[in-house]
Design a protein with these regions (language model features):
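Short helix-loop boundary/capping segments
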Residues: 143-196
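Bacterial N-terminal signal peptides that target proteins for export
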Residues: 1-7
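N-terminal signal peptide c-region/cleavage motif recognized by signal peptidases
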Residues: 16-18
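Surface-exposed, glycine/proline- and aromatic-rich loop segments on solvent-exposed faces
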Residues: 38-143
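Intrinsically disordered, low-complexity eukaryotic regions enriched in glycine, serine
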Residues: 25-36
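Acidic/polar low-complexity flexible segments
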Residues: 88-92, 205-247
Length: 247
């Protein structure tokens, strides 16, 4: 009798495992698997949902998320950034920038050659200036920039002498980038970020996509400074932002 019960329990567990895994990827954008060179950046699912006044940014990939980082070069110019990115239709004004100045995206990044979160000590060693390799979050504003390449996106530069509206946690770089300190979490193939909003309605009406990409820092500050140079994967395949929050 006991053996029969154990078999029944085991059978139920086996049947429930695929269902649970499938439920993890309900809604959002389901992406084609196996079309990225690096499995930790091969997107299989992207989703944004809201819980009260908090937005949950979710991305699942086909291998352990966050397990691959750029190789340090020892120099800022020419150094690389790896990123998990959620481009959205959210107005850039909602997070502290001017209104509608480009594509507002949440990005989780790693870059061992520089630190751009001067308010935070991600590795807990007491030094605020050596944490670039630790995965961390940014708001970035993106626009097509021909100086990055034909049809290529770059982080929007701040022209010399300009004083645009900027978030209070702007790190001082001459680009539309914020370092708000929302810690990403990694759990096997999933990376997530929880972001509080004063007006969650700005998120709940938004559309979104998912991108994994490499960026490169240029030698000249306004060359532009930071360009997308390697799009590893796009959830929709065409950056059409088909995702809808809470769907």
């Amino acid at each position: 009798m006991q053996g029969s019960s154990l078999v029944s329990v085991f059978t139920l567990l086996c049947l429930s495992l695929p269902v649970s895994a499938h439920q993890d990827h309900q809604g959002g954008i389901k992406a084609e698997q196996g079309n990225a060179k690096l499995a930790p950046f091969d997107i299989i699912h992207t989703k944004i949902s809201s819980e009260g006044n908090t937005a949950l940014f979710h991305m699942a990939v086909s291998a352990k998320a966050g397990s691959s980082k750029p190789t340090a070069t020892g120099e800022l110019a020419g150094s690389h950034v790896f990123s998990y990115v959620w481009p959205t239709s959210i107005d850039s004004y909602s997070v502290g920038f001017e209104r509608n100045v480009g594509i507002l995206a949440l990005a989780v990044t790693s870059h061992p050659d520089f630190d751009d979160t001067p308010l935070f000590d991600e590795n807990g060693d007491g030094d605020l200036k050596n944490d670039g390799a630790v995965w961390h979050s940014h708001w970035v504003v993106l626009q097509p920039n021909e100086r990055c390449g034909e049809g290529v996106l770059g982080v929007v530069d701040i022209p010399e002498g300009a004083s645009p509206r900027l978030p209070s946690t702007w790190p001082g770089l001459p680009i539309l980038l914020d370092s708000p300190g929302w810690d990403p979490t990694f759990n096997d193939e999933v990376v997530e970020v929880r972001v509080p909003f004063a007006d969650i309605g700005a998120v709940e009406t938004a559309s979104f996509d998912g991108v994994t990409a490499g960026l490169r820092v240029h030698q000249s500050v306004h060359a532009p400074l930071l360009c997308v140079v390697d799009v590893m994967d796009v959830s929709s395949g065409d950056l059409s932002l088909p995702g809808r929050v809470n769907r």
